[in-house]
């Protein structure tokens, strides 16, 4: 009997500790809007997010993986409760009210994408163009869904060069040079002034140029030619911005790789 009572008390203690951890985690995330606020200027800067999560984990004294996994569970639970009713009895519903705006923005963006997709599906395309267009699946490096991972979308890409991919049995065939390429151009959010934006573009390009390796493989040359052809279809301003987005993405990948080593 004494053993059973002790076990029950331990279970209650563990439950209280877990609840306190949840409350501490919710409060820590609330103080760091870069994690949840979609309008935050660093919301899509996943390296900055990784640094923030590392700081939260160190503050709470809990492994980073446990923090991110638990937060995803809490956030998804709150989103479901919010969809069901405005006055949920879930224990953390009031503490997580700061997520309401970001979740609504996310759902509105999804509705907008669905509406655009329906309009595109209703448009009748020229049969000859449908036969010429070659569909390739590419990773959209600029779109980030609510779970923070990159999305994959099917887009019609055409170019006059072949792309050779290592360990891939199929090669992407070339399409007619007279056909205009179609590609995804993300909406740009300018959080800073035009002068600061131009300075940042120049500084980023200079840093990247200083770090470029001289040894380039045939595969990389092939890919570079395709990217160059796509950039040449843009205006001067759009071309410069596209270069900066690509360079920043690669720089973030390098920083994240270094972060994961430690």
From Swiss-Prot:
Main location class: nucleus
* Xref: InterPro entries: BESS_motif (IPR004210), MADF-dom (IPR006578), TF_Adf1 (IPR039353)
Which residues does UniProt assign to DNA binding?
A: 24-104
| BP-aspect Gene Ontology terms | regulation of transcription by RNA polymerase II
A Pfam family annotated for this chain is MADF_DNA_bdg
In its record, the post-translational modification comment is: O-glycosylated; contains N-acetylglucosamine side chains.
Question: What SMART domains does the record tag this protein with?
Answer: MADF (SM00595)
**Annotated compartments:** Nucleus
Residue span, BESS domain: 217-256
Which molecular function term from Gene Ontology is one that the record holds? transcription cis-regulatory region binding
The record's Gene Ontology cellular component field reads: nucleus; transcription regulator complex
Keywords for this entry? DNA-binding, Nucleus, Transcription, Transcription regulation
PANTHER family documented for this protein: COREPRESSOR OF PANGOLIN, ISOFORM A-RELATED, MADF DOMAIN TRANSCRIPTION FACTOR
**Purpose:** May play an important role not only in the regulation of Adh expression but also in the transcription of other genes.
Can you say what this protein is called?
A: Transcription factor Adf-1
Query: What organism is this sequence from?
Result: Drosophila melanogaster
